[in-house]
């Protein structure tokens, strides 16, 4: 039974990486949050993270988990035959092969058709599962990342600023060369994961910045064992690439945010006569007193997975990842590390589960 809404110290942000079938873990995390009465104020996603985010933000509270489950069960029930069957046949509710792209790859067919698969099935699925009116109302804020094909610049489409449509979600999930670019106002976009697969910086760049509990749900393994075969090398390369230097991003944001806290404190120590001068007031605007708790949740490696794990849409794979998301999120919710006292000058506190012990680790 769902409990009453939690009262957390700050806005609740859910940050979702891209990762194809690995996104089932994210759905499990959200189910645990929902059942605990923790409702995100803001969801930020890339690729499958954008799809999950739209299914959450684009439905009323009572429909969010059911819509997620309907989407993921539809993928799993259609994946009989293993990963190679997915490559050659596609998934009826997600993508279907374009035969010409496989047989005549040099044909000048245009950017809108230049992909191995069509995502028209995904578009129809999302249209049936997302309430566009609810999405446009932006009661739960949604931000999705995509890359402009021509400039290579990363762009965040934010429901706070513009009404989001299904095409914005498809653009964020348009991973080349598998999926075609999607045009927004005439400009073609690809999957935001091409540029940055972990869009956590959007929280720190927000204006105005707010104290936040950030559930950062990562589905790729930044660290791993030494590979022993070409197959394992390919899998490890994919993990490193799509983990998207998450540790580095967070370390940089911690340094910047601590400097903001120091600036704020220094400004407060100035005599009133200096503090009120135009120059000091301008410098003080670079200060900030917000506190960011980053709760990192990392999808586990399944015993059977290989370099094709991101297209493992088997019912068992989806079930195991979903259940792992529920389990890990519940453990963090029960621990509630964001309630622990913090140094007022420490603006960013990272909490994560140890992959060795399963216990919560606090990193300041």
PLM regions with names:
Residues 1-12, 140, 147-150:
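Small-residue-rich anion-binding loops in enzyme active sites
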Residues 2, 8-15, 20-116, 120, ...:
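Patatin-like phospholipase
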Residues 43-44, 216-218:
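Short internal beta-strands
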Residues 53-55, 146-147, 346:
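Short secondary-structure transition/capping segments
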Residues 66-75, 185, 341-346:
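Short alpha-helical "patches" and their helix-cap loops
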Residues 67, 121, 125, 134, ...:
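Exposed alpha-helical structural elements
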Residues 85-217, 224-225, 280-300, 305-306, ...:
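Active-site-adjacent alpha/beta core region of enzyme catalytic domains
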Residues 219, 225-287, 321-326, 336-364:
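Terminal low-complexity/disordered tails
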């Amino acid at each position: 039974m769902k409990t009453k809404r939690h009262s957390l110290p700050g806005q609740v942000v859910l940050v979702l990486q891209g990762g194809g079938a690995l996104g089932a873990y994210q759905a499990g995390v959200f189910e645990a949050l929902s059942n605990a009465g923790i409702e995100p104020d803001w969801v930020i996603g890339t690729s499958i993270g954008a799809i999950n985010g739209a299914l959450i933000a684009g439905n009323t509270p009572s429909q969010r988990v059911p819509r997620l489950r309907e989407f993921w069960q539809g993928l799993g029930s259609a994946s009989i035959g293993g990963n190679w069957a997915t490559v050659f046949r596609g998934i009826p509710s997600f993508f279907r092969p374009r035969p010409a792209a496989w047989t005549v790859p040099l044909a000048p067919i245009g950017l809108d058709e230049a992909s191995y698969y069509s995502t028209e099935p995904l578009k129809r699925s999302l249209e049936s599962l997302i309430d566009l009116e609810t999405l446009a109302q932006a009661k739960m804020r949604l931000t999705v990342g995509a890359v402009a094909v021509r400039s290579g610049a990363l762009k965040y489409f934010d429901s706070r600023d513009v009404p989001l449509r299904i095409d914005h979600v498809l653009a964020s999930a348009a991973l080349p060369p598998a999926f075609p670019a999607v045009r927004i106002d005439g400009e073609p976009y690809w999957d935001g994961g091409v540029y940055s697969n972990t869009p956590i910086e959007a929280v720190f760049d927000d204006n105005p910045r707010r104290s936040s509990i950030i559930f950062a749900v990562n589905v790729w393994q930044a660290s791993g064992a030494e590979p022993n075969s070409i197959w394992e090398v390919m899998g490890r390369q994919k993990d490193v690439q799509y983990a998207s230097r998450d540790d580095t991003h967070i370390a940089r944001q911690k340094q910047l945010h601590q400097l903001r806290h120091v600036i704020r404190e220094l400004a407060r120590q100035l005599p009133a006569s200096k503090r009120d001068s135009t120059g000091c007031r301008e410098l003080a605007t670079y200060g900030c007193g917000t506190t960011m708790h980053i709760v990192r949740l990392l999808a586990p490696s399944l015993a059977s997975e290989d370099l094709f794990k991101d297209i493992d849409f088997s019912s068992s794979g989806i079930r195991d990842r979903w259940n792992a998301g529920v389990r890990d999120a519940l453990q963090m919710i029960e621990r509630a590390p964001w309630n622990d006292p913090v140094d007022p000058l420490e603006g960013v506190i990272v909490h994560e589960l140890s992959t060795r012990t399963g216990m919560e680790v606090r990193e300041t």
